[in-house]
Amino acid sequence: MAPDPEFFCATQTHGECLNRLEISLRLNRGLHVVIGDIGTGKTTLSRLLLERFLMYGSNYEFFLVLDPTWENSIDFLQFLKKLFRIESNTNSQVDLMNQIEHFLLDSTFNNNKRIVLIIDEGQKIRSDQIEIIRTLLNFETNNVKLIQVVIFAQPEFKELLQLHENFKDRIAFGFTVQPLGEKNTIEFIDHRLKVAGLDEDKKVFTEKAKALVYKHTKGYPRKIVVFCHHLIIDYIINGEEIINSEIVLTRMQ
């Protein structure tokens, strides 16, 4: 299921994460790590972060990595070279690092750009690539970091962090995205229905039905969206007046 920032509901945990992450980036803190289980909304948060900076027409330039599966450090550096649109034919790690550093210096001081690398699915990163990222974070002047990195990852990323204390110590902002509670789940459902254009006077779910949705999905946003999609299809096809607890229980079976 593709993330859709338009339907974002600023629940307490997601809203706090997004706001704190934005502040940390604007303060040029360096390394940021957001951890959460599958379906907790990490990818949506990454897209919202991009939208928020673009909205203000800022001098930040974001580079997005969706699938960090590289065989080795050279492959990772070659990927970054292409991502940063650096023209070069070298396969030397030292040369690639020097070229990337030159790009970051040029972007910062000649083009007045703050470079941010966003990595989704960060749990796929290998140990040797963690060291590359740590080296990139060393590129700084007395008062300016030449690159900031935001990693969105599943909980197993913590195991990799334990193996790299020097990298872990660099984390300026860390946040764990939790599933929604029952109250936020109900707000999440109501918000998405409103954004979809539902008349405020129209009720699609009973309160008991929404409580059962929470019980079934355990507050994971992706599961809530998929489950409610099935419920609404049932509601339309069967010509129901409202989605009640009986309809939800039937779908849960």
Placement of each model-derived feature along the sequence:
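Conserved Walker B catalytic segment
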Residues: 102-105, 109-152, 156-162
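Conserved AAA+ ATPase "SRH/arginine-finger" region at the nucleotide-binding site
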Residues: 66-67, 160-161, 172-186
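A short, basic N-terminal segment
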Residues: 1-29, 249
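Conserved NTP-binding/hydrolysis module of P-loop NTPases
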Residues: 71-90
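C-terminal alpha-helical "lid" subdomain
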Residues: 116, 146, 159, 166, ...
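A short hydrophobic beta-strand->loop->alpha-helix junction that borders the nucleotide-binding pocket
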Residues: 62-71
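Short regulatory helix/loop adjacent to the ATP-binding pocket of P-loop NTPases
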Residues: 50-53, 157-172
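Walker A/P-loop nucleotide-binding motif
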Residues: 27-48
